[in-house]
Amino acid sequence: MKRGEKPEGYRQMRPKTFPASNYPGSSRQMLQEIRESLRNLSKPSDASKAEHNLNKMSTEDPRQVRNPPKFGTHHKALQEIRNSLLPFANETSSSRSPSEVNPQMFQDLQAAGFDEDMVIQALQKTNNRSIEAAVEFISKMSYQDPRREQMSAAAARPINATMKPGNVQHSINRKQSWKGSKESLVPQRHGPSLGENVVYRSESPNSQADVGRPLSGSGIAAFAQAHPSNGQRVNPPPPPQVRSVTPPPPPRGQTPPPRGTTPPPPSWEPSSQTKRYSGNMEYVISRISPVPPGAWQEGYPPPPLTTSPMNPPSQAQRAISSVPVGRQPIIMQSTSKFNFTPGRPGVQNGGGQSDFIVHQNVPTGSVTRQPPPPYPLTPANGQSPSALQTGASAAPPSFANGNVPQSMMVPNRNSHNMELYNINVPGLQTAWPQSSSAPAQSSPSGGHEIPTWQPNIPVRSNSFNNPLGSRASHSANSQPSATTVTAITPAPIQQPVKSMRVLKPELQTALAPTHPSWMPQPVQTVQPTPFSEGTASSVPVIPPVAEAPSYQGPPPPYPKHLLHQNPSVPPYESVSKPCKDEQPSLPKEDDSEKSADSGDSGDKEKKQITTSPITVRKNKKDEERRESRIQSYSPQAFKFFMEQHVENVLKSHQQRLHRKKQLENEMMRVGLSQDAQDQMRKMLCQKESNYIRLKRAKMDKSMFVKIKTLGIGAFGEVCLARKVDTKALYATKTLRKKDVLLRNQVAHVKAERDILAEADNEWVVRLYYSFQDKDNLYFVMDYIPGGDMMSLLIRMGIFPENLARFYIAELTCAVESVHKMGFIHRDIKPDNILIDRDGHIKLTDFGLCTGFRWTHDSKYYQSGDHPRQDSMDFSNEWGDPSNCRCGDRLKPLERRAARQHQRCLAHSLVGTPNYIAPEVLLRTGYTQLCDWWSVGVILFEMLVGQPPFLAQTPLETQMKVINWQTSLHIPPQAKLSPEASDLIIKLCRGPEDRLGKNGADEIKAHPFFKTIDFSSDLRQQSASYIPKITHPTDTSNFDPVDPDKLWSDGSEEENISDTLNGWYKNGKHPEHAFYEFTFRRFFDDNGYPYNYPKPIEYEYIHSQGSEQQSDEDDQHTSSDGNNRDLVYV
């Protein structure tokens, strides 16, 4: 019947792997015996005998009918082989060993219409040099001669037609049986598979000759044609190579006749047992695709091409015929594995075929044989035949090695994967017949004669030749299903591997076991079917699509099968579904279910093909690529992050304890009742909980609306901004990461963030949030509307001594508060002293501040081995003016000289030499005393009107500072009081005798501050100067900003981002530079620092600030954790 057509009730079955034969001896011994017997075989074949066998097969189990390979010329040789294998056949007959089917398969091959002429012609063309040569010639002829394909297809069709829908299960490609028989028979050294022999010469022609005559290949062709998962031939592929396959179990109610009415020779039995393990697994894999019987390396008869259930007898003969070379292993049907009783032949065929498509090729007689003991599936017979059939694949551990050694399992998996993709795909089978074509041609010519049994070819070529049937059967066989009794020796397993023409089969192997495993899971209830996928495939075998297994040349091992196969191998899902369907149907062994399942599995198989292991792996690679896009960090970055993170976690804990202690102290001072105290404790706990949650909130610049720029710095700007949600006013300081990195200011920025976060006093500008984006760092701080001290100095010129005394007293308290926190400001100057609306000062710009912490060391943030100079460690040119030879460079170094000079000038931007202590400039080591030097210089400037060491260039200024003993002069015209002059002289001197060495109290005790009461809060006293502020956003106290210096938004940001990314990638700068930068203050009152937006109600600062501190602020007066993410309550 035409490809794609299926006999009514026909069910496409996937070829099943045949269990290893019962051969008692080692697989190698069996193979050697087979090899020897094949060498001594005579080529004449008894056509009549073959026909008799074929008829016998067809009568015994129409399902098992496949195009019987004709071994007309070699019939005698085949008979001799059968005789030598009778002992094994007897053993396998009990287990339904395929050896019994051998005589029948010969007859079936002849009855199937395989011409002996092809075999004869092959022998003539090859001058009877060897069986291998004849098989190769027949393979080529079968590929080239479509007529023979039609003949082989026609031979298979009658069998399909004869099959009964009820009993007929889709012929299962018995490639495995072919594999098992042949591999077990043929020594492993025959590397190439039959397909290879057909399409390619076997790897070891000698071994091929030794193997003896494989089936003329007609059997394989018949198998390929008859193998359509439907069990009926869809378009007959070019005659697939004939492979010995165990016929499917006889239809229900029928007792499967032993394969080949005569049991295979005893020699076959042992080999079949041995093969059952290795051969079954390997051959199921490699034999699933039809291979010329002669090509089967392992001596396993090539799996018969189970085109349709109608061909079971011929299939059995084929299996035998492929074996007839004298090494034809007896292949038990998968059903026999399940110990299907003859009474259950129909069930066995249905289940066995679905489970082991290859086995269906074996005559029902062989099916009736129980699988060799290694296959535990025998008990599956107890199950309903259909259950056994469909569940057989599931019941035997798919690739679980239930009965088959894992060594066999692995090779079988390899070939199984390939074959699974080939099985049930008519297109693939058609394509595969190339490798199986030689056997197919031989089959039309009655080609059991093919003298050249290419053992290597059978292994791989089977998997390739019977893409459809082979895969289906292979999947089933690859599982340790008892369905196939094909004797398989470990050697055959190795051979399939040798036969593998492509590395991809290994990938297939990986997936193939998955398919069988998955299939068995759905069908696990039914143990008889070891390969659930096989079961599914058997269901797909019903649909004509699956039933068109054309075994032309073996297509490229894996991908092509997947692409071309449609239903032969159900995809994982399809397999599982058919298994589920078949499980219910297993008891029935209903072909209708199989056909329906086969249709579904066909579609699923297409999907499965689409999702071949290769495709899956490719997808995984894509995922890996996506994962690789995630930035990976260096060990240094990890170390840096973990050190800071752990330090901050511990710090946060200490701050929580401190806040709790503050609350207790405040409640004790106020004298709250116990109930009130409990209520306050609960409130604190709630705030702590909210803080832990809220500090993880993300912040970005979109939360703030910029109102006006207040100032531009070396690498940042300060703007007045309003928070969108609370409408509160803040001063936002923005730093470009690019500039921070270029100027090596990472450590300074980290120090500034730490001091602002930890500082919780009125002398330091309060930091509310710090966060960052890819380009910038952001500090959100109190807005101080009074401007800075430098602006006031410029406007007033010289301060009255009382005003100077007031500001210096507050500055002393502010510096003391910084020192108490363990920091050194290092950059105390009028520019960094802000005046609030009440006239009191606050320190800001802690860019040069340091806490002598490892995170504040600029060298810690440098990548590479080139140490960069700390920004506060001035260059050597500062030390000695003569060292700066910027103009004395050689012309080739002029460009470098210019950069060197710029470096000198840059230091004037980082710490003006006018206010820097000499020990800092000399880098002789400095302490907190350096800040007191700056206080003396500022006092001098307030009273005199200019800095004491003013010079034309920073270099000269530095030299004056270093030589302060000679350069420091208080001009008499300034008319300073003796106390003021004395304080200046005592502050501006060497650190060893500088005032403040013993603490700030020394300075407070100086006569200059005799009118200042440091015991009371200076901030509560009225200031001598109160700035004028007309409205909340008044910025008149700040110097106007040059419009040309304003930051421009736009393309520059993109360039900055690109630059940063390039630096990080090139390792120029460490990626951990800005770790742990984000921060959120513990009590920020939802953005209202004083419960009202600033500075509208700024006059309430004191009252509300005191209220906050009395209850809550005291709890949190310590600055919120250093590294708390910015979160707003």
Swiss-Prot record:
Its EC number is 2.7.11.1. Autophosphorylated and phosphorylated during M-phase of the cell cycle. Phosphorylated by STK3/MST2 at Ser-908 and Thr-1078, which results in its activation. Phosphorylated by MAP4Ks; in parallel to STK3/MST2 and resulting to its activation. Phosphorylation at Ser-463 by NUAK1 and NUAK2 leads to decreased protein level and is required to regulate cellular senescence and cellular ploidy. One of its GO terms (molecular function) is protein kinase binding. It is found in: Cytoplasm, Cytoskeleton, Microtubule organizing center, Centrosome; Cytoplasm, Cytoskeleton, Spindle; Midbody; Cytoplasm, Cytoskeleton, Microtubule organizing center, Spindle pole body. Residues 1-11, 46-64, 578-608, 620-629 have a biased composition (Basic and acidic residues). Residues 1010-1089 form the AGC-kinase C-terminal domain. ATP binds at residues 710-718, 733. GO terms for cellular component: centrosome; cytoplasm; glutamatergic synapse; midbody; postsynapse; spindle pole. Negative regulator of YAP1 in the Hippo signaling pathway that plays a pivotal role in organ size control and tumor suppression by restricting proliferation and promoting apoptosis. The core of this pathway is composed of a kinase cascade wherein STK3/MST2 and STK4/MST1, in complex with its regulatory protein SAV1, phosphorylates and activates LATS1/2 in complex with its regulatory protein MOB1, which in turn phosphorylates and inactivates YAP1 oncoprotein and WWTR1/TAZ. This is Serine/threonine-protein kinase LATS1. It comes from Mus musculus (Mouse).
